[in-house]
């Protein structure tokens, strides 16, 4: 009897150790590598370098947050990863490697058949307001399945996706105007999950929702990440939100990733002057500084970018050397694009 109990205990321990080993291995495997990605808008007025030589890496079970002010290039980066940029937007350089496969040179047809919605999906900014008012939720979800996958049980996929986001499957027979803002946001998240992707890009998923519903949506994304092993790339201007959610954070400014690192490191020890200014602008519970700080000046005109650091005109530490393009300095847990650390 004692031997049987010992055997069961040993088996259980081995099972637990095995699972921990799998998690440890997964955490070291690169799921997404973005190398020197460039996405520009080529207009009559000039070229807008919305995403300019952006590089980062996401490993197996990490969540990634992209923060920055309006027009910093966050949404363009998300669209570029899904290859959903519309003219005059265009990817003009760089590489995207997904789970060891370089997907940058894939034809549009191959990308659509094998990657879009199947491996990478996106909850677009304001997507809940683009649901077609004359079609039921179920019929709109069916269109996604028809476009990207054939010979599958549509009802089963729709049922499972709605259940995963905490909605009753009966929602599929309802129209958008019959749903609350929070329910509509859950619907567009369910749409992104339909074909079981490995990565979901969520662009400002809590915009226009009240505080309670915002918290519910973020908790939903956390749950999906935990239960499905889903990698979520959260794009937002809300630093508090991103610090709460993400393992790693990238700070974008004027089309460039100026700092990248762990959420804890960026919060406790921000390096780039822009990151420092952002962190100083959010309230902290135990801060000795009672007054919030604000960033003077405004972002540069993206059509008239000068050589050098793009934060130059607003930086309190700017020096003559900063008129030259700053190098990307590798740190222990990330990098910073700034001459101060050369």
Predicted regions and their residues:
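A short, flexible loop at the N-terminus of ABC-type nucleotide-binding domains that lies
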Residues: 28-31, 40-53, 84-89, 107-111, ...
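ABC ATPase NBD coupling module
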Residues: 90, 103-121, 147, 265-270, ...
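Conserved ABC ATPase signature
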Residues: 175-179, 183
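A short, proline-enriched helix->beta-strand linker immediately N-terminal to the Walker B motif
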Residues: 194-198
């Amino acid at each position: 009897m004692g031997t049987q109990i010992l055997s069961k205990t040993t088996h259980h321990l081995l099972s637990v150790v095995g699972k921990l080993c799998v998690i440890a291995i997964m955490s070291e495997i690169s799921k997404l590598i973005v190398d020197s990605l460039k996405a520009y808008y080529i207009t009559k007025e000039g070229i807008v370098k919305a995403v300019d030589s952006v590089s980062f890496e996401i490993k197996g079970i990490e969540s990634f947050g992209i923060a920055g002010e309006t027009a910093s290039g966050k949404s363009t980066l998300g669209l570029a990863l899904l290859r959903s940029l519309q003219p005059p937007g265009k990817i003009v350089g760089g590489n995207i490697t997904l789970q060891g496969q370089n997907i940058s040179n894939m034809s549009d047809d191959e990308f659509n058949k094998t990657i879009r919605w199947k491996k990478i999906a996106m909850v677009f900014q304001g997507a809940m307001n683009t649901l077609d008012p004359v079609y039921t939720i179920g019929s709109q979800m069916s269109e996604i399945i028809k476009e990207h996958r054939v010979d599958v049980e549509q009802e089963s996929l729709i049922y499972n996706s709605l259940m995963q986001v905490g909605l009753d499957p009966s929602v599929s027979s309802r129209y958008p105007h019959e749903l609350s803002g929070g329910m509509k946001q859950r619907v567009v998240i369910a749409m992104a999950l339909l074909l079981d992707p490995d990565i979901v890009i969520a662009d400002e998923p809590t915009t226009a929702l009240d505080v309670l519903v915002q918290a519910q949506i973020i908790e939903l994304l956390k749950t999906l990440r935990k239960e499905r092993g889903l990698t979520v790339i959260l794009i937002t201007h809300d630093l508090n939100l991103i610090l709460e959610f993400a393992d790693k954070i990238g700070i974008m400014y004027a089309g460039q990733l100026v700092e990248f690192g762990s959420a804890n490191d960026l919060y406790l020890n921000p390096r780039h002057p822009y990151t420092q200014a952002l962190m100083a602008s959010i309230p902290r519970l135990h801060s000795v500084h009672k007054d919030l700080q604000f960033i003077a000046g405004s972002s540069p005109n993206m059509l008239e970018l000068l050589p050098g650091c793009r934060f130059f005109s607003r930086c309190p530490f700017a020096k003559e050397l900063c008129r030259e393009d700053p190098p990307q300095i590798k740190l222990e847990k990330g990098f910073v694009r700034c001459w101060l650390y050369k």
